[in-house]
Structure formats: structure tokens, C-alpha cells
Curated annotation (Swiss-Prot):
Involved in the initial step of iron uptake by binding ferric vibriobactin, an iron chelatin siderophore that allows V.cholerae to extract iron from the environment. Keywords: Cell outer membrane, Ion transport, Iron, Iron transport, Membrane, Receptor, Signal, TonB box, Transmembrane, Transmembrane beta strand, Transport, Virulence. A motif (TonB box) lies at residues 33-40. The lineage of its organism: Bacteria, Pseudomonadati, Pseudomonadota, Gammaproteobacteria, Vibrionales. The gene is irgA. This is Iron-regulated outer membrane virulence protein. One of its GO terms (molecular function) is siderophore uptake transmembrane transporter activity.
Amino acid sequence: MSRFNPSPVSLSVTLGLMFSASAFAQDATKTDETMVVTAAGYAQVIQNAPASISVISREDLESRYYRDVTDALKSVPGVTVTGGGDTTDISIRGMGSNYTLILVDGKRQTSRQTRPNSDGPGIEQGWLPPLQAIERIEVIRGPMSTLYGSDAIGGVINIITRKDQQQWSGNVQLSTVVQENRASGDEQSANFFVTGPLSDALSLQVYGQTTQRDEDEIEHGYGDKSLRSLTSKLNYQLNPDHQLQLEAGVSAQDRENNVGKSAQSSGCRGTCSNTDNQYRRNHVAVSHQGDWQGVGQSDTYLQYEENTNKSREMSIDNTVFKSTLVAPIGEHMLSFGVEGKHESLEDKTSNKISSRTHISNTQWAGFIEDEWALAEQFRLTFGGRLDHDKNYGSHFSPRVYGVWNLDPLWTVKGGVSTGFRAPQLREVTPDWGQVSGGGNIYGNPDLQPETSINKELSLMYSTGSGLAASLTAFHNDFKDKITRVACPANICTAGPNQWGATPTYRVNIDEAETYGAEATLSLPITESVELSSSYTYTHSEQKSGNFAGRPLLQLPKHLFNANLSWQTTDRLNSWANLNYRGKEMQPEGGASNDDFIAPSYTFIDTGVTYALTDTATIKAAVYNLFDQEVNYAEYGYVEDGRRYWLGLDIAF
């Protein structure tokens, strides 16, 4: 690999992909009437949504190759993809992945408690629907616990799937990735989406995917990864105002790292060995959407998910019930509802201080929000949520947010919102102790939720015909952070572990703050060429504890993304993308953290999409065009070098 040395072949590919056709292009101008549902629980124009929100459209997703959702999120302001290789995760506004809530059609999903200690980054994204099933991705930056409860401290990612059609239709995508460096593993994938009516009132939807990534012959590189999923939905239209849906799905992830290939071959505690991890997720859900004439619209669901880490004999069953009613009352749009969650963890391997293998917990919550149209151009949203947990008691999460449409072009947004994360099951269980190289970790029943208060102000400009810009400033106070400290001998009686490390337990002690700015620009250069870009500045600092003065996470302060799209002809679209990741901040500290600072890097990708027919489209791209090297010695993770992608989409 080279540091950044564009070869003649690379430059030829760039020019060929970006300027491979010449003709007057069709009008690419579009109106900015993007609708979102995550910010308030009902559909509204994005400019009026009471939150900082970004949308990745289906068109954006279709134009190129994404390994998973993390790749698609790299262009979203405020979002940082942490780690590398097949252990990436998502940070929003400087908060760790544990503080990002992931939803699919508004339904929460998480399997993190099947992966204690390291949390197994890179797994959560594998449970998400395949590309062909996704209509759009909505990303809220900042806390949203008033509507969504625990975990929504950093932000919320909501995957919106495609709706049923009145006639049978579908899509299939086949793709392959070929690495220029033959020590890196190639990848093959296929995903599909099919929907259609079974009768006048009953419709069916089925989607799934299979992906195989070969193992690198690079130490600390990508392991062998196999991903498979299948989901089916039945929709029954009871009458014009009420609909029932039954959903069921199965997913599997198998990951293997071998010594001599991607697994560490030296410096291990004891003998370095191969790893073989098998994760499974099964889920079933029933939901109802109703239009109660003269009252409002309701959305109710009951979901059960079973997540299993077969390799470590761990499983967690999550049962969630949520019901929301949105009711217009004069100048008010009132949203209120209830939510309940039951967690049941079975872990036969990680507890080393007692015979206990099962933990469970139940949470209930009530919430209410009101969007009040105080004037024709000004709306004020305020609300609160009361959660009750049998472990820590009750917690209240308020928020207030204003949206002011200065005129048809300018909008000002701002407000104060709160978030919290409830302690995980192992963290609050007194007779539970996990093995850790930095000291065995004991549970603490006195833990309270981690909390945050976010303040933000945004200025948005949009012509409605393609030109749009925004600037957002935010400040987040993070309190009661759960951290590990030395455990008193009268509580942790076992003493040092086999590595000589003294026992630890978790307490609410640390405080931190994050602040920064986010900017976006979309600019139609001509009728056929459009530029879009985003910039993120993030600063974080721990205000207390052993690592006061250090950042909350080891993240870059500066991120920049730019994308150029050219609708070359009616059938041909060319694009190029630049992604800059700045030098990382100082390490956040801790026994398991590397004490070095990863330098900056820039990736440039380019590709084309060509419609062979009305139903068949071929796509090609070169990723990491200039073969920028990101290796373990300098960065702490490995990224792929130059690689070539070829995809075929078929619609029917």
C-alpha cells in the first residue's frame, strides 16, 4: 500500500468513471419535502421536526456498496464510526456505542448483553434489514429518552423498511468485492425483497440476505464472517382505518479468526488461540396501526426477541410492549403512551463468584409530548417520560424544543433534551463477578442510571429546489457515568485474579462533557451535477475520576465528507466520495486502552450506476482509490486497501 500516491491506473479509473459519457442530463432538481417520523412519533417535514435529524434515502443506499449500516452513516454529521475492520461501531456526538439506540420501524433492538466485557463491536449492525428492504434511515443526533427511554443518550438510528405494494414486485441484488491486496479477504453477498397481495385485505412481505467475507491473512485484520437472515411480514387490513401486522425473522452471524491469519499470534495472555463465535437472533412481533376518527392515530406493538451467543452459552430474551396515541387538539399535537420491557438473561460461563446463571428485570414507563403551535411560524414541543425499574426505582426525562420558520427559506431550531441509560443486568447484580484482565468485575445493586442534558441550536437554509445548508452547535453534560473502581475487600472477597489484577466494581462517579458543531451543504452545481458535504467538530472531556482531562472516547476532533454526483445520462450516474477522518484525540485512559494517537487519513471512492434496462441495473466502484494504508501498528485497527465492487440489481 502507499501513503497517498495516485497511480496512472487510479487516475484513469477516476476519469473514466466520472466522465465516461457526455450528454445533456435530465433535470436532477428536487424539492426538499423529506418526511420523517422519529423526532415526534408521527410524520412531518424534516424542517419542522423537533430534533437534529438526518435522512439517508433509498436512492442514496442503492447507488453504492455498503458493508453494513455503519458504512452508510459515515457521511452523517455528528456520527463517528469507531474502530475498524469487522469490529466497527457507532458513536453519536462523542458518546459511545452503548448510548446509541437502534430501532427498526420504531421497534428497539439490542443484543449487547450477550457480549460482556468487550461488547463485541460490529455485531449489532448485522441484525439490521438488508439494503433492498430499507426505505430510508433516520438519524437523530442528541438525546431522545423522552420518547424512546433508556440508551438514547447519544442519539437514535431508526431503520424504516419498505411498505407493501398493491401488486407483486421485488428486488434482488447480487454483488462481489475483489481486493487488490490478495492478503485481504474478498466478499460475496446477495439480498432480496418481495412483496405483494394475497387477497384484497391480506399482503405478504419477505426479505433476506446472505453475505460471506473471507478471512484476511493480516494479523488483527478481518476475520471470516458469514451473515444470513430471513424476515417475513403479514399485513391484514381490517378496514380502511385499522391494520394488523405479524412479523417473524431469524438471523445468524458466524465469525472466525485463526492464528496465522487474522488472529493475534503473540502478546496474548497465555497461549494465542483461534476464535469461533456464533451469534443468533430470532424475533416475532405483532403490531396495530389505527386511525380513530375524531380522536387520533395509534401505533401499538408487542415484540419478543431472543439473542444467543452460542460460543459462550449466553442468551437474552427481550419482550417489549409500546402503545402511542397522537391526537390533534386545536393548536396542539399531543403524543402520549406507555411502554414496558422485560429482560431475561441466561449466562452459564461468565459468573465466577457464585452459581447464579439467570438474571431478569422489568421496566415500565409513561410518556407525553405536546407540540404547540404558538404562532403560524413557531412551534414549541415539550414533554416528559417517567420510567420505573425494579432495580433503581424511578427516573424522569423531560425535554423542550422550539422550531421557528423565519420565512420559507430559513429555519431556527433549538432546545434542551435529556437522556439516560439504565444499568445493565450484570452491573446491578451483587452475586455476579465477571473475569477481566484488568481486574474481575463485580455487580453493584446501588447503581443509578447514567444521565445527560443536551443543549443545541441549529440554523437551516433550504430553497426547496436542491440548495440547502445547516449549522448546529451542541453541548452535552454527561453525569453519573458508570465506571470501574477498586473494590473494597469487604465486598469483593476473592482477591486478585489469575493475572494478578485486583477486583473492581462499578459505581456512579464520573462526569464528562461533549460539545461541538455540525455543518452540512447540498449544492446543485448544474442541472445534472450535485455536491453534498458535511463537517463535524467534536470535543469531549472527562471532568472527574482517574482520567479527568482526557476525552470520553478516543475519537477524531474533525470529520469531513464530500460527495459529487453526476447524472450523466438518463441511464448513467457517476459519483465520487471523499471521507476525511482527522487525528484522534488523546486516549481516554484505562487498563485496556492503547496509549497512542491514531493519525488522520483520507479515503476517496468513485463509481458508476448504469441502467441496462428498466428492470436491470449494473453498478461498479473502486473503494479506497489511492490505496491509503490503515494498519494496526499506527491506528489500532486494519482497514481494507484498494478494492473493486461489482453489483447487479434486478427489479420485477
